[in-house]
Regions:
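A short, flexible beta-alpha/helix-coil linker loop
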Residues: 41, 132-134
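Conserved N-terminal beta1-alpha1 strand-loop-helix module at the mouth
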Residues: 1-90, 97-124, 141-144, 151-160, ...
Length: 208
């Protein structure tokens, strides 16, 4: 059965957060964000596991799904609702073997070949990007624009999550290009009021 993914996919990047991850997760989940991913490339595995367990608990209180970035082992041990892997991380099927059938496994793609390869896996959703220029990642991939979303939409029935440089001002055109969800990091994490910003995304999504 095809996954129905929320219109807004929040990414809490440790380098962007203005306040603690736990407080931000609670604010986002209470605002109605249905899926929250935590990304911290510098934290130790032990601390990532500890953080993830607490974030699982926080998200569960509000009915949100928590996703771990990169680490299926941590996701499984923490009882997270999913893991997101990149092109250099463990393959989707290996992540699935670690996390189980009930866990979401998502994968990042940056071109048509990768989208086609992802379609042939058990990935629950396919992330496509970066759609717009972004400074969130130190070594960002080349901007793919809305055109790759349109092409990917014709290539797969899996949910598409657009990522990269997405703001509340340009989110609508991304959804209308064929994305089921927009993954947002900086525009939420760096916001003075992440919950208010999240509610604005959700308000705009409700008018599609």
């Amino acid at each position: 059965m095809t996954l129905v993914i929320p219109r807004l996919y929040a990414i809490m990047d440790a380098l962007l957060l203005r306040t603690g991850a736990f407080a931000v997760a609670d604010a986002l989940a209470s605002a109605g964000v249905g899926v929250i991913q935590y990304r911290d490339k510098q934290i130790s595995a032990r601390n990532l596991l500890s953080h993830s367990r607490e974030l699982v608990s926080i998200c569960a209180r509000h009915g949100a799904r928590f996703v771990v970035n990169d680490r299926p082992d941590v996701a499984a041990l923490a009882g997270a609702g999913g893991v997101h892997v990149g092109q250099e991380d463990l393959p989707v099927e290996d992540a699935r073997a670690i996390c189980g059938r009930d866990s979401w496994v998502g994968i990042s793609t940056h071109n048509e070949v990768q989208v086609r390869e992802a379609e042939a896996t058990s990935a629950d959703y396919i992330a496509v990007g970066p759609i717009f220029p972004t400074s969130t990642k130190q070594q960002a991939d080349s901007v793919v624009g809305l055109e790759l979303i349109r092409k990917a939409r014709s290539m797969t029935r899996k949910p598409l999550v657009a990522i990269g440089g997405i703001t509340v001002e340009n989110a609508e055109q991304v959804w209308r290009a064929g994305a089921d969800s927009v993954a947002v990091a900086r525009d939420l994490c760096a916001a003075e009021d992440p919950a208010a910003k999240a509610r604005e995304y959700l308000r705009r999504a409700s008018h599609l």
